């Protein structure tokens, strides 16, 4: 039977553990609020870019552009698809990392002609340990998502898409629905899905106004799409970070 001193030591140990756990929770909560605030502050700009693309496609539904070209001449089995997988940096988030990796493996089995890109140490180490080639690891901590890092990621993938090294670009991340639930999301970034910018997704009070695109529709699209892709990746990084903190 434990003596009084041993019991006191165990009580102190439990109390110390509780203090550490509470401190970790407070830190995670603070980081989560900070990241959500950062996303909310940048959303208006990226929504504006998205609306520019919507307006262009609404006025010119038959517009042709490399970012809209689905490359139908390339057979499905010959298409090279790039996948950005966003995981955590640590394995302490339980099902959070497991669900992402499980979904990534399923996708890669269905798309054998793929190129893998990782953000987050957990995913990178897992795929490497399983002998799965990683095309590029973006050495950015998931703990600090920034627009600059999102822009570097989008620039790399868009460059490979433009040089036809990739026929499609996808991203896999976790989206926080609310503080109690989250879900794994897979989205194709390139080529753009026109239905994401369809007129019926716009508020009904937006008029079908005439407008002029200078210097040309192609130039406007050249500017708008990279900004849109960067905004989507940044949002995915922030959502993934919030999910990890909340897991």
Predicted regions and their residues:
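C-terminal beta-strand-loop-alpha-helix "lid" module of Rossmann-like NAD(P)-dependent dehydrogenases
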Residues: 1-247
């Amino acid at each position: 039977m434990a003596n009084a001193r041993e019991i006191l030591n165990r009580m102190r140990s439990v109390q110390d553990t509780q203090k550490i756990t509470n401190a970790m929770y407070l830190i995670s909560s603070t980081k989560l609020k900070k990241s959500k605030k950062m996303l909310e502050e940048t959303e208006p700009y990226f929504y504006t870019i998205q609306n520019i693309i919507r307006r262009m496609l609404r006025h010119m539904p038959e517009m042709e552009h490399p970012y809209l070209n689905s490359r139908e001449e390339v057979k499905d089995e010959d298409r090279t698809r790039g996948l950005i997988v966003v995981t955590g940096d640590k394995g302490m988030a339980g099902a959070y990392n497991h669900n992402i990796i499980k979904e990534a493996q399923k996708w890669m089995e269905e798309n054998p002609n793929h190129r893998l890109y990782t953000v987050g140490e957990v995913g990178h180490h897992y795929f490497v340990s399983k002998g799965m080639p990683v095309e590029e690891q973006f050495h950015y901590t998931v703990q600090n998502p920034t627009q600059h890092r999102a822009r570097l990621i989008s620039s790399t993938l868009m460059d490979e898409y433009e040089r036809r090294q990739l026929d499609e670009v996808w991203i896999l991340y976790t989206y926080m629905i609310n503080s109690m639930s989250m879900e794994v999301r897979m989205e194709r970034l390139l080529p753009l899905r026109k239905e994401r910018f369809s007129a019926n997704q716009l508020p009904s009070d937006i008029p079908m106004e005439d407008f002029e695109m200078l210097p040309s529709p192609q130039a406007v699209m050249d500017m708008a799409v990279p900004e849109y892709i960067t905004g989507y990746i940044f949002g995915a990084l922030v959502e993934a970070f919030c999910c990890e903190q909340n897991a």
